[in-house]
């Protein structure tokens, strides 16, 4: 009787354990570059990839590439886009080492620059951010040299 009960118990447990399904995504699937710096999932279920070529969004079927602009100029992702966050309202934020903050505008389906550290130049001699962090209050903390700047996203 104990063996039969054990067999049914093991059968029930094994049927609850499902196999994980993995899918490889590469350049042949539309990924803009194999070098990926950050990955973030947004509130709508999209997977965002910060690559050496910019931002890619995966909807489960297709990958769409986004160019991030500062005005009319393309932002070089490999040196200017470094951190990727989602806030409590599921807005996607991208922060770059040169002190720029971008958010994904769902209405216009593009990234828009919303903040730039005043006085921080585009050349490497003037310094860069060493870290950026988004806290639970949706504030982005920008750390550079001997000072910290807080940007409130609301």
Predicted feature residues:
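Carboxylate-rich, polar loop motifs that coordinate divalent cations or form catalytic acidic clusters
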Residues: 1-154
